[in-house]
Curated annotation (Swiss-Prot):
It comes from Clostridium perfringens (strain ATCC 13124 / DSM 756 / JCM 1290 / NCIMB 6125 / NCTC 8237 / Type A). The gene is kdpB. This is Potassium-transporting ATPase ATP-binding subunit. ATP binds at residues 350, 354, 383-390, 401. It is a multi-pass membrane protein. Its EC number is 7.2.2.6. SUPFAM superfamilies: Calcium ATPase, transduction domain A, Calcium ATPase, transmembrane domain M, HAD-like. GO terms for molecular function: ATP binding; ATP hydrolysis activity; magnesium ion binding; P-type potassium transmembrane transporter activity. GO terms for cellular component: plasma membrane. Keywords: ATP-binding, Cell membrane, Ion transport, Magnesium, Membrane, Metal-binding, Nucleotide-binding, Phosphoprotein, Potassium, Potassium transport, Translocase, Transmembrane, Transmembrane helix, Transport.
């Protein structure tokens, strides 16, 4: 079963991360993070300088060099630990998935007609296009599409949800996933991929990070960080030569050591964000996995953070999706109780949510209870797509209910009359966003049942929050424009696309993209595939077809259309976290500059004492304090990098102002306080 991590850490994860921290000291791995590679080289150099100092070749006091060397190694290890702990969360999820994936015997058949002739083969021998039969109690050995039959399937190994789902041939519920189990009946499945290419294989690879590539934003930020590091490297290297020149000019001894300058370089380089950058990206992917969403790339998550157009399906996302009877509206002087009675009689054999709600409404409003008509020679008329109505013939009466067009046709063909009053009420209900069902008895209209598609509680507030963030919401529906406009107004969406077709959705996405917008949408059917392939963030439902899943760049394992809003929030949280910690890291440099530069060169330039605003005890204590802070701030920020900066539904300008205040100003003030405190402590302990 897919596990969800509720806590950031556990003992097993920490032990594995600590072990991996040392494994990551491999130079090839360190080279992947250029900023931390500089710290890695500085750690090696200070270690060599310490060994030299033991043989009398002194750059500084051996104890000072040893302290600096240990702290620099800790800085590298802490960075490795941050990345390893983020990867560990993914590995834990991958282990749970791998336990559900095992080689099993499959029942391969030649064709549906000869399904009784079964050959047993290992699941690893199955190839794309093979037909397999899976019976109750058996595990589905490979991904595919149901081409015959229907069955109840337990997908808890993938989704974590214990409730079984129906998978059947045809339509948008035909896709099945290897590793899931058939609970009842049997199905014939056409295998959709070769070994190693299954949905489960992709999930394991993604959550382990095996196929994770740096996103364009990550690469751009890393280029900035490397550029800053190179600048500081050049500056630090030139400082040694300049200090030698200045000491000769002033006739004083040059107290600036290579160890001190290496410590200065590490403190001034953006090591905090350099250490946490990879962990932030991995953690963003992990948070998405915990939300039961599989992203095909980190780029998709970042795009979710930049999205400014959300295309949302009405049914299931904005409305509850099951229309409920809310009112009986008599016409042409008909009695409302007679209308309710006729409506209930015509719905007694109707097992749809709408039919059951009509029976309940008649009982609640008029005390009319359901009756057993099986012994009364009642003849129930089932709803069909052709007639678009249902009903009952009972005690010589013909009762029908259905769409206005179908009932109008039915009664006019039998010499009845469809009044203007009825036409007006039908139009009025449609304008309000409801669905009118007309009820007729013996070719005479009694009235209308007002079916209301209930807008989900709280969606209007959600859309208002999204609007504040600069995100435009568009409702996609197959309803007529009048109904769509009414529901759109009630839900508070910015726009809508009524009577939506696959071509209409695709063209709308293209139009928005031409104007520079980033578009997100959800889909589950083969007809959604073109639009999903075009969208910047395309979330396919796990219950959807193989074509939809292949077209999307994310798959929602819970198949919940509302998940798109959560995905956008996770994407924005990822970008906010990266920006906040970058701001904090660069702001830190200001305090570290004032901590190290004045004490380091005060012997050459006494005037620099004015810049020693922290009044640190000595050059050695100042450098040690700054390096200690530089190392341990990484550990303190790991929980924030993994959990993410708290997300708020406010405008981009307000978010920017808040983050500049908290992480910019905070990034300047925090090191001043911490470095001064560390300086006092190490002086009291007599370390320097």
């Amino acid at each position: 079963m897919k596990e969800k991590e509720n806590s950031l850490f556990n003992s097993k994860m920490i032990k594995r991360a600590m072990k991996d921290s040392f494994i990551k000291l491999n130079p090839k791995i360190q080279l992947q993070n250029p900023v931390m590679f500089i710290v890695y080289i500085a750690s090696i150099l200070t270690t060599v300088l310490y060994v030299f100092s033991l043989f009398g070749i002194k750059d500084n006091s051996p104890s000072f060099i040893l302290f600096i060397s240990i702290l620099l190694w800790f800085t590298v290890l802490f960075a490795n630990f941050a990345e390893a702990i983020a990867e560990g969360r993914g590995k834990a999820q991958a282990d749970a998935l791998r336990s559900a994936k095992k080689d099993i015997l499959a029942n391969r058949i030649e064709s549906i007609e000869t399904k009784e002739k079964v050959s047993k083969v290992n699941s690893t021998e199955l190839r794309k296009g093979d037909l397999i039969i899976v019976k109750a109690g058996e595990q589905i050995p490979a991904d595919g599409d149901v081409v015959y039959g229907a069955a109840s399937v337990d997908e808890s190994a993938i989704t974590g949800e214990s409730a079984p789902v129906i998978r059947e041939s045809g339509g948008d519920r035909s896709a099945v996933t290897g590793g899931t189990q058939v609970i009842s009946d049997y199905i014939v499945v056409k295998v959709s991929n070769n070994p190693g290419e299954s949905f489960m294989d992709k999930m394991i690879a993604m959550v382990e990070g095996a196929s994770r590539k740096k996103t364009p934003n990550e690469i751009a930020l890393q280029i900035l960080l490397v550029s800053l590091t190179i600048i500081f490297l050049v500056v630090t290297a030139s400082l040694y030569a300049y200090s030698e020149f200045a000491s000769n000019q002033n006739g004083v001894i040059n107290s600036t050591s290579v160890t001190s300058l290496l410590a200065l370089l590490v403190c001034l380089a953006p090591t905090t964000i350099g250490a946490l950058l990879s962990a932030i990206g991995i953690a963003g992917m992990s948070r998405l996995n915990q939300a039961n969403v599989l992203a095909m790339s980190g780029r998709a998550i970042e795009a979710a953070g930049d999205v400014d157009i959300l295309m949302l399906d009405k049914t299931g996302t904005i409305t509850l999706g099951n229309r409920q009877a809310s009112e009986f509206l008599p016409v042409d002087g008909a009695n409302i109780e007679e209308l309710a009675d006729a409506a209930q009689l015509s719905s007694l054999a109707d097992e749809t949510p709408e039919g059951r709600s009509i029976v309940i409404l008649a009982k609640e409003q008029f005390g009319i209870r359901g009756r057993d008509l099986s012994s009364s020679n009642a003849k129930f008329i089932e709803f069909t797509a052709k007639t678009r109505m249902s009903g009952v013939d009972f005690n010589g009466d013909e009762i029908r209910k259905g769409s206005a067009e179908s009932i109008k046709k039915y009664i006019t063909e039998h010499g009845g009359d469809f009044s203007d009053e009825c036409e007006k009420k039908v139009e009025e209900i449609a304008r309000k966003g409801g669905t009118p069902l007309v009820v007729a008895k013996n070719y005479k209209v009694l009235g209308i049942i007002y079916l209301k598609d209930i807008v989900k509680r709280g969606v209007k507030e959600k859309f208002s929050d999204l609007r504040k963030m600069g995100i435009k919401t568009i409702m996609i529906t197959g309803d007529n424009p009048l109904t769509a406009a009414a529901i759109a107004a009630e839900a508070g969406v910015d726009d809508f696309l009524a009577e939506a077709t696959p071509e209409g959705k695709l063209n709308m996405i293209k139009d928005f993209q031409k104007k520079g917008h980033l578009v997100a949408m959800t889909g589950d059917g083969t007809n959604d595939a073109p639009a999903l392939a075009q969208a910047d963030v395309a979330v396919a439902m796990n219950t959807g077809t193989q074509a939809a899943k292949e077209a999307g760049n994310m798959v929602d394992l819970d198949s919940s259309p509302t998940k798109l809003i959560e995905i956008v929030k996770i994407g924005k949280q990822l970008l906010m976290t990266r920006g906040a910690l970058t701001t904090f890291s660069i702001a830190n440099d200001i305090a570290k500059y004032f901590a190290i530069i004045p004490p380091l060169f005060i012997g050459l330039f006494p005037e620099l004492s004015r810049l020693n605003i922290m009044n640190l005890q000595s050059p050695e204590s100042a450098i040690l304090s700054a390096v200690i802070y530089n190392a341990f701030i990484i550990i303190f920020l790991i929980p924030l990098a993994l959990k993410g900066v708290k997300y708020r539904e406010v405008s981009a300008n307000k978010l920017l102002s808040r983050n500049l205040f908290v992480y910019g100003l905070g990034g300047i003030i925090a090191p001043f306080i911490a470095i001064k405190g560390i300086d006092i402590l190490i002086t009291m302990l007599g370390i320097v």
